Amino acid sequence: MSEVLPADSGVDTLAVFMASSGTTDVTNRNSPATPPNTLNLRSSHNELLNAEIKHTETKNSTPPKCRKKYALTNIQAAMGLSDPAAQPLLGNGSANIKLVKNGENQLRKAAEQGQQDPNKNLSPTAVINITSEKLEGKEPHPQDSSSCEILPSQPRRTKSFLNYYADLETSARELEQNRGNHHGTAEEKSQPVQGQASTIIGNGDLLLQKPNRPQSSPEDGQVATVSSSPETKKDHPKTGAKTDCALHRIQNLAPSDEESSWTTLSQDSASPSSPDETDIWSDHSFQTDPDLPPGWKRVSDIAGTYYWHIPTGTTQWERPVSIPADLQGSRKGSLSSVTPSPTPENEKQPWSDFAVLNGGKINSDIWKDLHAATVNPDPSLKEFEGATLRYASLKLRNAPHPDDDDSCSINSDPEAKCFAVRSLGWVEMAEEDLAPGKSSVAVNNCIRQLSYCKNDIRDTVGIWGEGKDMYLILENDMLSLVDPMDRSVLHSQPIVSIRVWGVGRDNGRDFAYVARDKDTRILKCHVFRCDTPAKAIATSLHEICSKIMAERKNAKALACSSLQERANVNLDVPLQVDFPTPKTELVQKFHVQYLGMLPVDKPVGMDILNSAIENLMTSSNKEDWLSVNMNVADATVTVISEKNEEEVLVECRVRFLSFMGVGKDVHTFAFIMDTGNQRFECHVFWCEPNAGNVSEAVQAACMLRYQKCLVARPPSQKVRPPPPPADSVTRRVTTNVKRGVLSLIDTLKQKRPVTEMP
């Protein structure tokens, strides 16, 4: 017998019995199910509820539009999570409103499915829990007032609800102390193997009684099907009843960290010869492949055939292998030794621990509901669940390793070398910086400039890959920068076009190379920060360049051998001609003062040269003379302004220089240039300390030019005209010209010996 508190005079009291879940053994129930204990409602509140429901029925006569079942599924309830917003808040002011809302929602369900409202009290003396019987697969039938059942409500075993549970107990004790020792009694039916707890709602306060017996039926510990949350209020289709029941039972298996009775299972009461369990494993759907281990099921769909382990939910393409009995026994022993029987309070037992702690047995009702939910589920949910599990399982099992993928895609050539780098940008360089002895310092300055200058992070101009990580690959005589994400080539540079490369002096992970841009044709020094010492990149480049030089040397040797073979055959082809080897032009620079230019009448003559020098010196002041640089090369004499190196004042080809000499003053030097159309110009210069060096340089350029002309047209290839008569005027003039040229050459040789010509 349970005690009932008397209600206040102004408010009716609704007394509801709820089965206790504190000591319920979920997985070890072999006795037949018994209906829950019932209690007559002693108040007239049900009549008010019936009136409200009838009033609502007149308004909402048309059922709502049909919805898909998966839209009505409570995701949090299916996953075993608690919704704090969905927990009932029982109070004095909200009890009547909540009951009316529950009645309206159940009326909509009855109108759509043509069934009786499971939560509506049919009469003050007859209350039937239709929902509980429907979940058990039974047909509802009316009973007398003493055996009518009320929907058992079990509190959710979550941390937040347990706190609320404790608050309700505290408030109930205070209410009991305030009201005194007024108690009411209620009759209840119970069996010897079951224990119950009563829940009494009076004036909106909840009082939980302690269980009278240590064990109770699992049916009494089912989760309540009527909730105050909006998701659970919605109607559920008939085809989803088994699925919902299975989900509620699975959620019911989640152990509580506050109640040790839920985590400590009794192995003594397990019946290995339970008829329900044998019926489950002998079902035809699980016997499609008798060679499969227990718990495995073969599933075939459009994607192929795969195997599903029902207790754990894992899927795999490979066929599972049965474990021998001796291994299974050893495995059970090891698991039981690892997992202690008294579970700590701060730990939760997974599904597999329930099976292990219970001797490998799981309650037959749980298997029935789980089997019903998996064999005949909603088609849309089944298709979605299968595809999701299959995709996740295959992704986790067959996903390729990223390192292997990178190595396969990048190192396609076994001789290719890959380095992880990050671009720091580039700096423009001048041609003079790459001269021998200067290139090393210039490259190191570029590395320092880009390594230590902290520019704006958004300024990524000239930085390959916007400063992100990339791969520097040396493959097939090419230096390539590759994006590690999509393998796109950001930049490629032929190794033979790289002028200089080097490693930073301050940081051994800085690498730089200098090459000419293929579009702008300017020299750029590209700098990179490497993940590994940059010496490896420099060594690899050196090896590649050595290989290229060796290949070119071999090709040249083959070409020479082919030329010798052709010479032996006496083939008169142009390839047999020995061309002069080109050499770098030697330029001599002199700092002089430019007096100016004066037109003259004749191209040669010392008197004409001296006359032009005197005229320019008398007509101009020394302050007006320009400081210039005279560059004397083999083919050109160039006069450039000293202030602006890009300003060319005079440019005279040596082939057009007709006369040169030193004036009466040893500081003066002048030359006459033929501009064409019988026009001649005399350019005058003032030299310090004297004009000897300048005159010798120009003289050497003239001699070199003359010898090049002789080499270009040797005497053997000249077309010789017929010799004139011995007494003709032409022969006498030709002889005089030859003598004059030879005497001029002899005079120049006496002044300065000519260097050996190439």
UniProtKB/Swiss-Prot annotation:
GO MF annotations in UniProt: amyloid-beta binding; molecular adaptor activity
Keyword Transport: no
Domain of life assignment: Eukaryota
Pfam families referenced in this protein's UniProt entry, alphabetically: PID, WW
Keyword annotations from UniProtKB, A to Z: Endoplasmic reticulum, Endosome, Golgi apparatus, Phosphoprotein, Repeat
Domain WW intervals: 290-322
Disulfide bonds: none
GO biological process: axon guidance; extracellular matrix organization; intracellular signal transduction; maintenance of lens transparency; negative regulation of apoptotic process; negative regulation of cell cycle phase transition; negative regulation of transcription by RNA polymerase II; neuron migration
Biased composition (Polar residues): 212-230, 261-275, 331-340
Cellular compartments annotated: Endoplasmic reticulum; Golgi apparatus; Early endosome
Function: Plays a role in the maintenance of lens transparency, and may also play a role in muscle cell strength. Involved in hippocampal neurite branching and neuromuscular junction formation, as a result plays a role in spatial memory functioning. Activates transcription of APP.
Record PANTHER family: AMYLOID BETA A4 PRECURSOR PROTEIN-BINDING FAMILY B (PTHR14058), AMYLOID BETA PRECURSOR PROTEIN BINDING FAMILY B MEMBER 2 (PTHR14058:SF11)
Protein name per UniProt: Amyloid beta precursor protein binding family B member 2
Organism expressing this protein natively: Homo sapiens
